[in-house]
């Protein structure tokens, strides 16, 4: 009888622990160390606070969200665990920040993108390498990858030491319009998520990548609060629709022509 009681108590404890553990994650798992060499972290210089994610697209440029802008920031590359430093981690500062100023046929939903030129080139290493830009737009129905050091609880904020990765589905833009009627009829954004809920990007994942077929297709932009609600996907700035702007700046064109 005593043995049965002990085993029953152990089972209760185990089930309780499993339930609490599952409540600590907005979907996803710790990223594999080798799968996010392009993922960068943006920090505030004065407070040291972690702000946002971003993506290294070549040795001199990082792509992130415009709303991540702060006057004094630095960019950390090659990081996995905030508590343990790799030998090849590197820190850079913005040399110049570029924002999408175009107004013709563009709404505020189309402009949450920022290109940062670093103060000096990054050295590729075991934990640092750029992610390729797309040559074509992503297809609805694609399974895409998101990642970041954003909060793992919502609405209360709990920041992890390691980045979390998850797979989400690329949805038709009309799905997001059906949920959020204030969205414009046409937009240079992507709609993505898991309609069953439980998996989502969240606060401080902003600026991080949406990766489809190994290419940077989106930048984490906006989502409903709390995060990971059923039938409430999130919005991602569509990188392909801003490709000419990005490539013109990298090529040194200071008078970038806005797309039609």
Curated annotation (Swiss-Prot):
Record keyword Protease present: yes
Top-level enzyme category: hydrolase
One biological process term in Gene Ontology: proteolysis
Family annotation (Pfam families): Trypsin (PF00089)
InterPro entries: Peptidase_S1_PA, Peptidase_S1_PA_chymotrypsin, Peptidase_S1A, Trypsin_dom, TRYPSIN_HIS
Cystine pairs: 31-165, 52-68, 102-258, 144-212, 176-191, 202-227
Domain of life: Eukaryota
Expression across tissues: Expressed by the venom gland.
One GO cellular component term: extracellular region
Annotated Peptidase S1 domain residues: 25-251
Glycosylation sites: 105, 156, 172, 253
Subcellular location: Secreted
Keyword annotations: Blood coagulation cascade activating toxin, Disulfide bond, Glycoprotein, Hemostasis impairing toxin, Hydrolase, Protease, Secreted, Serine protease, Signal, Toxin, Zymogen
Active-site residues, as the UniProt record annotates them: 67 (charge relay system), 112 (charge relay system), 206 (charge relay system)
Location, primary (coarse class): secreted
Signal peptide: 1-18
Documented EC number(s): 3.4.21.-
SUPFAM superfamilies for this protein: Trypsin-like serine proteases
GO molecular function, one term: toxin activity
Propeptide: 19-24
Described purpose of this protein according to its UniProt entry: Thrombin-like snake venom serine protease.
Subunit structure: Monomer.
Similarity comment text for this entry: Belongs to the peptidase S1 family. Snake venom subfamily.
Name of the protein in question: Thrombin-like enzyme 2
Organism encoding this protein: Trimeresurus albolabris (White-lipped pit viper)
């Amino acid at each position: 009888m005593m043995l049965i009681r002990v085993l029953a108590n152990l089972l209760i404890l185990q089930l309780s622990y499993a339930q609490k553990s599952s409540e600590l994650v907005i979907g996803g798992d710790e990223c594999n160390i080798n799968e996010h060499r392009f993922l960068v972290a943006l920090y505030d210089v004065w407070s040291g606070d972690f702000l946002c994610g971003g993506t290294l697209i070549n040795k001199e440029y990082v792509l992130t969200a415009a709303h991540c802008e702060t006057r004094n920031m630095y960019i950390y590359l090659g990081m996995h665990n905030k508590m343990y430093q790799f030998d090849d981690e590197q820190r850079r500062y913005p040399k110049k920040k570029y924002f999408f100023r175009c107004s013709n046929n563009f709404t505020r939903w189309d402009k949450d993108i920022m290109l940062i030129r670093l103060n000096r080139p990054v050295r590729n290493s075991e934990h640092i390498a750029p992610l390729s830009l797309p040559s074509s737009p992503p297809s609805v129905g694609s399974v895409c990858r998101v990642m970041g050091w954003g909060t793992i609880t919502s609405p209360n904020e709990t920041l992890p030491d390691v980045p979390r990765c998850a797979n989400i589905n690329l949805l038709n833009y009309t799905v997001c319009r059906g949920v959020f009627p204030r969205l414009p009829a046409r937009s240079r954004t992507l709609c993505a998520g898991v309609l069953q809920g439980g998996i989502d990007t969240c606060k401080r994942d902003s600026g991080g990548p949406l990766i489809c077929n190994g290419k940077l297709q989106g930048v984490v932009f906006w989502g409903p609060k709390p995060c990971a609600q059923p039938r409430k996907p999130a919005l991602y700035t569509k990188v392909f629709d801003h490709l000419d702007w990005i490539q013109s700046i990298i090529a040194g064109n200071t008078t970038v022509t806005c797309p039609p």
